[in-house]
């Protein structure tokens, strides 16, 4: 068994993936987008467990599973024994005992997956669909696929990530891998929402200092659900100070692209009429999510078969 297969028993954090593995997943995602097929004859079983609300991640994993011909075991948190006090560990232990091959999990607890993948009893593979404000590897991979399709490389690209940095698992996943891939990173947004850990990966700037220099301008959602109740900014003030206005859009380089992991607070992070503007790749990101998640599932299942 190769080192690559061993490492992909689970996909839980971008920190755990090598650059080679990341590039293979991106390129395989592009192959799936171009029509590659891989029907499974042994009917692997996948269960999606979402303990936080989701549209894009949840549904694109479902579409990816359908396209791969996998068997899906529906799991509804609201009608499960979780509501009787069952722990996440015991829930996954049960699904593993039932023969589920892969569990795709989103959970509010950061690093929830560590206990699961360390268990000698749980044999199901874990794909992290987002852990609180920790990591979001599949979102990061679809972002990378979108950038790679546009530019064909990462080395030397200037990438700005702007918005609610501290609460964003997308920012934390992307900053680590983009630096390893050779991109130059800039971070913008309210000072109240940026911790010192970002300084290890790039420069803190204002959006107006960097908007006309970047190749990729990535905005982040203001995550109201992870903030204390007292609002720091009104929507109007936030948009004026930190959002993509028409004036800022006009300053982007001709070849620059606009990204956002969504859901979008329109007229907060990005002006409503700019969400689908010519430089926007937001819809493409959503589309690419299906294909890169197909690549993730394929790689995890291949690793299981190799075992």
UniProtKB/Swiss-Prot annotation:
Domain of life: Bacteria
Keywords: Pyrimidine biosynthesis, Transferase
Reaction(s) catalysed by this chain's protein: carbamoyl phosphate + L-aspartate = N-carbamoyl-L-aspartate + phosphate + H(+)
EC number: 2.1.3.2
Pathway: Pyrimidine metabolism; UMP biosynthesis via de novo pathway; (S)-dihydroorotate from bicarbonate: step 2/3
Pfam family, one: OTCace_N
Residues that bind carbamoyl phosphate: 56-57, 106, 136, 139, 262-263
MF terms in GO: amino acid binding; aspartate carbamoyltransferase activity
GO biological process terms held by the UniProt record: 'de novo' pyrimidine nucleobase biosynthetic process; 'de novo' UMP biosynthetic process; amino acid metabolic process
Positions bound to L-aspartate: 84, 169, 221
Gene Ontology CC, one term: cytosol
Top EC group: transferase
Function: Catalyzes the condensation of carbamoyl phosphate and aspartate to form carbamoyl aspartate and inorganic phosphate, the committed step in the de novo pyrimidine nucleotide biosynthesis pathway.
Family of this protein: Belongs to the aspartate/ornithine carbamoyltransferase superfamily. ATCase family.
Subunit structure: Heterododecamer (2C3:3R2) of six catalytic PyrB chains organized as two trimers (C3), and six regulatory PyrI chains organized as three dimers (R2).
Protein name per its UniProtKB record: Aspartate carbamoyltransferase catalytic subunit
Natural source organism: Streptococcus pneumoniae serotype 4 (strain ATCC BAA-334 / TIGR4)
Organismal lineage: Bacteria, Bacillati, Bacillota, Bacilli, Lactobacillales
Gene: pyrB
